[in-house]
């Protein structure tokens, strides 16, 4: 190691290494060939270099010094020499490209391919709250992926939508139009009877001079016609300004020229019905219907026919022009990749009900057959009750997001009566449910065919012992009244509890938990109230397998059991019970106006419309009065109060 000094002699007297001597004041001096340094900064820097050298030496030799602390040095930023070059992102393990146009992206021959690859990978993000990866090109081929629907779904796995009745909506709009047509209810009206009116004595004198017979004098707006109402027969009377400006000579000449140009011997006009109104006419009507609240910001007030047209569009969107139609999707989404995709799009709701009911009946009928053909060793009454419950749960999960997962005609009819489910979808849903139950019973029967043959004693022997596993039949000692009310009570409990679980104003379960609770509800009804009649509570669950049973050996006798039980018991009891259960819940708990129980009368609608218009007027009138109050304060210094609603 060599040591330097600021003031060293030209030649060294000895080659002996210098020795350090530490003085009491902390200064370091060199003996023999080096003079003592008198500057503190030079000594400090020399000492620091020496300590750093010792630290490096200790690190190189593998040793460490615990008594000495090395100085901290800032980390140098590593500069990538290739930062300006295009570095393509290498896909992670398991990332493959199946399409031919994507296989070429694996080789990065030029910067353009790398840029395309980088853009491709940046688009592949997780969709929504799901952790599932969606390929960006998959999204291009499936535009509906991740798109939000703007249509109601009466699902049993989420709170029910709040849909207004079409007749009630039309009545609400009509009441609104009638209220706005009155002079005292128009926006911008300056009726003297209102608080905060800006009517002055000069206005009254001017109106009394030019008042026409048959007009109201209680409202200035009836004379001035500031609000251009639709269908007004009387032309508005324009008020002359107090300080009119004299027209110039040039203006008079222009007017006279126009009159000369437009003077013809023949006068003709086209009636309103002689041609269809064009887009320009509609725009001019809209401009005429513009209202100004503060003199600068125009506010467009929709025409009555426009309100009715919008309401018809909204209600038709809720009902759906066809089964499975969704109005929230763009025209690009309506292009289908193949022919079957188009069929599925228009029939996805019936398909969903079909699959949901099929899953329900497979589990339910399978549980019945397993407990019967094994003579209790393969199941019990409790196990078959849970089989029906979990089958119902899975059926709702299968169809809940598409059709709602009703899988029960009693539920569908109750939804149509009390929750404004479209009536034109009711028969389609019921037919799909019956067909799904038919195939579900057929699959369960085919699964247990060998066990049924062994239990019956031959392949051509079929009795009601196994037939009762496919369809319902009351016990022989149960009277018809008792059997009917068994189904009535069971279905009323089912539908009433469903209305409570699906009411967002009550205490709905968490997201996705409603179907699980419905499954436990069905199992509880079976274990507590299902022994005497095999708890039908679902007409489709009975009719579908009954039709199948009559076709495979049980014969028409399946329909004649217990005085045609399937008509008044399996269908009449559950449907009547479901309606009664929903009615009881709406009478005592539900407050939504979509239910016939809470349907508002004319007085309530007029009251609500009046309150809305009153609040709207005072909001606008308050703005105008504030502005006028500012102007008056500048002149008189008095404060003008804003009118308040009584």
From Swiss-Prot:
Principal localisation: membrane
Localization annotation: Cell membrane
Membrane-related topology note: Multi-pass membrane protein
GO BP terms, alphabetized: glycerol transmembrane transport; transmembrane transport; water transport
Biased composition (Basic and acidic residues): 19-41
Composition bias, Polar residues: 190-201
Residue numbers covered by motif NPA 1: 408-410
Coiled-coil region list: none
Molecular function as annotated in GO: glycerol channel activity; water channel activity
Any one GO cellular component localisation term in the record: cell periphery
Transmembrane intervals: 351-371, 384-404, 428-448, 482-502, 510-530, 570-590
Region (Disordered): 1-68, 175-262, 621-646
Keywords: Cell membrane, Membrane, Repeat, Transmembrane, Transmembrane helix, Transport
Record-linked Pfam families: MIP
Listed Low complexity bias regions: 1-14
Cytoplasmic topological intervals: 1-350, 405-427, 503-509, 591-646
SUPFAM superfamilies, sorted: Aquaporin-like
Intervals of motif NPA 2: 538-540
Stretches in topological domain Extracellular: 372-383, 449-481, 531-569
Domain notes: Aquaporins contain two tandem repeats each containing three membrane-spanning domains and a pore-forming loop with the signature motif Asn-Pro-Ala (NPA).
Protein name: Aquaglycerol porin AQY3
Organism of this sequence: Saccharomyces cerevisiae (strain ATCC 204508 / S288c)
Lineage, opening ranks: Eukaryota, Fungi, Dikarya, Ascomycota, Saccharomycotina
């Amino acid at each position: 190691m060599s040591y330097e000094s600021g003031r060293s002699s030209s030649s060294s007297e000895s080659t002996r290494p210098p020795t350090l001597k530490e003085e009491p004041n902390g200064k370091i001096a060199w003996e023999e060939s080096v003079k003592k340094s008198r500057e503190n900064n030079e000594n400090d820097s020399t000492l620091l270099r020496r300590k750093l050298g010792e630290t490096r030496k200790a690190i190189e030799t593998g040793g460490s010094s615990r008594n000495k602390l090395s100085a901290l040095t800032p980390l140098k930023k590593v500069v990538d020499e290739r930062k300006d070059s295009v570095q393509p992102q290498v896909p992670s393990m398991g990332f493959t490209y199946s399409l031919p146009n994507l296989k070429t992206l694996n080789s990065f021959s030029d910067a353009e391919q790398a840029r395309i690859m980088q853009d491709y990978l940046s688009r592949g993000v997780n969709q929504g709250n799901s952790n599932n990866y969606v390929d960006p090109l998959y999204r291009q081929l499936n535009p509906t992926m991740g798109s939000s629907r703007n249509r109601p779904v009466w699902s049993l796995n989420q709170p029910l939508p709040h849909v207004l009745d079409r007749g009630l909506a039309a009545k609400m709009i009509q009441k609104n139009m009638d209220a706005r047509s009155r002079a005292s209810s128009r926006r911008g009206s300056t009726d003297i009877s209102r608080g905060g009116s800006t009517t002055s004595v000069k206005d009254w004198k001017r109106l009394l001079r030019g008042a026409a017979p048959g007009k109201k004098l209680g409202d200035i707006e009836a004379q001035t016609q500031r609000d251009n109402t639709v269908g007004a027969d009387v032309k508005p009377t324009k008020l002359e300004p107090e300080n009119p400006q004299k027209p110039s000579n040039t203006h008079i000449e222009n007017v006279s020229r126009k009159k000369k140009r437009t003077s013809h011997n023949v006068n003709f006009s086209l009636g309103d019905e002689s041609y269809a109104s064009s887009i320009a006419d509609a725009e001019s009507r809209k401009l005429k219907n513009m209202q100004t609240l503060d003199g600068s910001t125009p506010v467009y007030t929709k025409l009555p026919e426009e309100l009715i047209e919008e309401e018809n569009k909204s209600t038709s969107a809720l009902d759906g022009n066809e089964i499975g139609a969704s109005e929230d999707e763009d025209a690009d989404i309506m292009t289908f990749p193949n022919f079957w995709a188009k069929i599925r799009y228009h029939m996805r709701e019936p398909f969903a009900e079909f699959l949901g009911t099929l899953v329900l009946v497979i589990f339910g009928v399978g549980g019945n057959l397993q407990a019967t053909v094994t003579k209790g060793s393969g199941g019990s009454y409790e196990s078959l009750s849970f089989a029906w419950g979990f089958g119902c749960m899975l059926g709702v999960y299968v169809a809940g997001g598409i059709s709602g997962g009703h899988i029960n005609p009693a539920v569908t009819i109750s939804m149509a009566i009390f929750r404004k489910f479209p009536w034109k979808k009711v028969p389609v849903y019921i037919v799909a449910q019956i067909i799904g139950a038919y195939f579900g019973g057929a699959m369960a029967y085919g699964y247990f065919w060998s066990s049924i043959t062994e239990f019956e004693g031959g392949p051509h022997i079929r009795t009601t012992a196994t037939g009762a596993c496919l369809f319902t039949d009351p016990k022989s000692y149960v009277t018809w009244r008792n059997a009917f009310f068994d189904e009535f009570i069971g279905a009323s409990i089912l539908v009433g509890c469903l209305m409570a679980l699906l009411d967002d104003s009550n205490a709905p379960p968490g997201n996705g938990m409603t179907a699980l609770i419905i499954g436990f509800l069905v199992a509880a009804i079976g274990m507590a109230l299902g022994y005497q009649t095999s708890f039908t509570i679902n007409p489709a669950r009975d009719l579908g397998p009954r039709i199948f049973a009559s076709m495979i050996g049980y014969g028409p006798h399946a329909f004649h059991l217990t005085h045609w039980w399937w008509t008044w018991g399996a269908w009449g009891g559950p449907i009547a019970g479901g309606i009664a259960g929903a009615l009881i819940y709406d009478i005592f708990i539900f407050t939504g106006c979509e239910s016939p129980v809470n349907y508002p009368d004319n007085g309530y609608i007029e009251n609500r419309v009046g309150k809305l218009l009153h609040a709207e007027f005072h909001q606008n009138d308050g703005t105008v009065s504030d502005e006028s109050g500012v102007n008056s304060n500048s002149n008189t210094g008095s404060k003008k109060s804003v009118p308040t609603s009584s």
